[in-house]
Amino acid sequence: MRFTALLIFVFVCVAGYSQSFDTVQIRAIKLTDKIHMLKGSGGNIGLLSGGDGLLMIDDQFAPLSEKISKAIAGIDGGPVRFLVNTHIHGDHTGGNENFKQLGVTLVAHDFVRDRMMKESVNLRTNATNPPRDKAAWPEITFADRMNFHLNDEDIELHHFTNGHTDGDIVIRFVKANVYHVGDLFNRTSFPYIDAGNGGNFSGLLVNLDKILALIDDNAKVIPGHGNLATKADVNAYRDMLYELHDNVAKAMKSGKKIEDIPALNLTAKYDDVFGKGFIKGKDFILIVAQAVAAEKTEKKTKK
């Protein structure tokens, strides 16, 4: 009955949207007997199923809630009890209102709720975004660490520092050795550092170091976007970012200015893999250059 109610509710919501989501299919990938990864349009969804109720991680866009719900029902007909947001962005939280309508409890970092309650500015486009509807706000929030014990699984929620945004979290399924890391790791694009929502490139590097210290070689890693990954994939991504950071730092030390950096084509060998996504190589390397300049200023200030 709960899923039937959701389908009715979502049908009303979807009617007000563009039909661009009509062709999207939600595909469920089984990781363990109780954990699935769902792919569609937007951020990857994680799902823990079992008799205690379902725990869902991220919910993509509002017009997809009906399709997501059908996919979940095909895995486990039980109710979704908890919905965890990995961060604030709408391609991960767009369905919050729809699922909350059914009494699903929303969980996120403190900063996610704080930012949803306020007007924000997209620094890439200078567009002003109004506060999210109250129905989208998380009801349970935390600062650094939170634990769930559900369906004979121990689930850890970790917040390390600002990275992609200031509210990014990593979800660890301890017994299953499965991790959902949100957009701290994106297999389809160079990183988007959302400074308007507290993002920080240097902090992203710290986050990746922390993630790699947490996981082992047998772990299954759900990225924010793209296919299921391993520790080796995360390590390669982290190494790429450090390499680009160091190459930018060398160029600027030799006299190059921030605006000179994109013309150096420092991302060229990675563009085929990461340069076709949301953030292009020349846009990303400019973010890195700004971060390097900020690090240099900070060092001078501390002297």
Positions of predicted regions on the chain:
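Accessory terminal helices/loops
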Residues: 14-19, 213-215, 228-303
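Solvent-exposed loop/turn segments at secondary-structure junctions
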Residues: 42-45, 54-56, 61-64, 88-93, ...
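Divalent metal-coordination and catalytic microenvironments
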Residues: 34, 48, 58, 72, ...
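Bacterial Sec-dependent N-terminal signal peptides
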Residues: 1-19
